[in-house]
């Protein structure tokens, strides 16, 4: 359960929503009252939703999952970076690049380019065999990539979940996560649609103290999950598999079927002789795949 009190939330100003003329009707269920033209959020409901989201993050990390922290608005950048770094999780605190998730393969190539540039000594003109201007351009390229991709340099695959500050600001990130079936935990203010994410946290998404409080809270959930993962690993390595999203399972099954087809084709004569056997084996494979699916747990261009 999340270790947070109503007093902490009130002091951080999480109860203050937007002006009444700037609201999303779907947030009505989380609004307590209106005061001086500003909506007041019902923090009792927020607490309940925090507990649910906290347990989800903890469980996800405990099963070897990763959580991507996202917050590019000025009030959230430092909190996102510090919290994610503390628990060794990936983060995006600068501009979200289109395709960061949906075109992850290309993004990975840019990350590799960043790592390559980091090995260079930009002060060694003679040893590099490059001119000062060429080295300067390469250094600028490295600095730009560091700002854009430094937070995900160690993310080798798409995340298992995302924590987002302000879903209106990070609409593209949320959209990409949904396309890949990645659950989203997000701070949702009174001007946003709580149904746009799986785990909404109704709260003020503009107050720096409030953002820090909630971001650190979910970083604590990650930390608890890491501790639980460590305990599970010492008992059994079989519990360390990362839960796969539905799209990952589908891709894996397609690759497995493609491999089976390649191995099955030897020569035309052999195929004709063993046609019935292969047919039976293919039916069995499909039956096994269906059984596994039934048992399995459901889950701008890049510059």
Swiss-Prot record:
Presence of the UniProt keyword Ribonucleoprotein in the record: yes
UniProt feature, compositional bias: Basic and acidic residues: 294-303
PROSITE patterns named in the record: RIBOSOMAL_S2_2
Flavoprotein in keyword set: no
GO cellular component: cytosolic small ribosomal subunit
Keywords on record: Ribonucleoprotein, Ribosomal protein
Region listing for Disordered, in residue ranges: 258-303
InterPro entries: Ribosomal_uS2 (IPR001865), Ribosomal_uS2_bac/mit/plastid (IPR005706), Ribosomal_uS2_CS (IPR018130), Ribosomal_uS2_flav_dom_sf (IPR023591)
Any one GO MF annotation of this record: structural constituent of ribosome
CDD domains assigned to the protein according to its UniProt record, in alphabetical order: RPS2 (cd01425)
GO BP annotations, alphabetical order: translation
Similarity section: Belongs to the universal ribosomal protein uS2 family.
Protein's name in the database: Small ribosomal subunit protein uS2
Species per Swiss-Prot/TrEMBL record: Bifidobacterium animalis subsp. lactis (strain AD011)
């Amino acid at each position: 359960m999340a270790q947070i009190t109503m007093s902490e939330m009130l002091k951080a100003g999480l109860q203050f929503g937007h002006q009444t003329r700037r609201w999303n009707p779907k947030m009505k269920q989380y609004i307590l009252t209106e005061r001086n033209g500003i909506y007041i959020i019902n923090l009792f409901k927020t607490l309940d939703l925090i507990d649910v989201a906290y347990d989800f993050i903890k469980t996800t990390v405990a099963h070897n999952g990763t959580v991507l922290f996202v917050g590019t608005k000025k009030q959230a950048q430092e909190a996102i970076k510090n919290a994610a770094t503390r628990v060794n999780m990936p983060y995006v605190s600068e501009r979200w690049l289109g395709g960061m998730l949906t075109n992850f393969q290309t993004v990975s190539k840019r990350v590799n380019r960043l790592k390559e540039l980091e090995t260079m000594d930009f002060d060694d003109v003679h040893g590099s065999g490059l001119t000062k201007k060429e080295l300067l351009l390469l250094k600028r390229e490295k600095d730009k990539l560091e700002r854009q991709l430094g937070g995900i340099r160690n993310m080798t695959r798409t995340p298992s979940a995302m924590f987002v500050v302000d879903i209106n600001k990070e609409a593209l990130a949320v959209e990409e996560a949904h396309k890949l079936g990645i659950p989203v935990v997000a701070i949702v203010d009174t001007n946003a649609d709580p149904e746009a994410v799986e785990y909404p946290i109704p709260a003020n998404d503009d107050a720096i103290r409030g953002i820090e409080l909630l971001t650190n809270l979910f970083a604590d959930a990650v930390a608890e999950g890491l501790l639980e993962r460590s305990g599970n690993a010492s008992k059994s390595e079989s519990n360390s598999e990362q839960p796969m999203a539905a799209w990952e399972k589908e891709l894996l099954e397609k690759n497995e079927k493609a491999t089976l087809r390649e191995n099955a084709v030897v020569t035309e004569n052999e195929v004709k002789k063993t046609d019935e056997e292969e047919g039976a084996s293919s039916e069995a494979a499909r039956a096994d795949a269906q059984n596994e699916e039934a048992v399995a747990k459901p889950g701008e261009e890049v510059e």
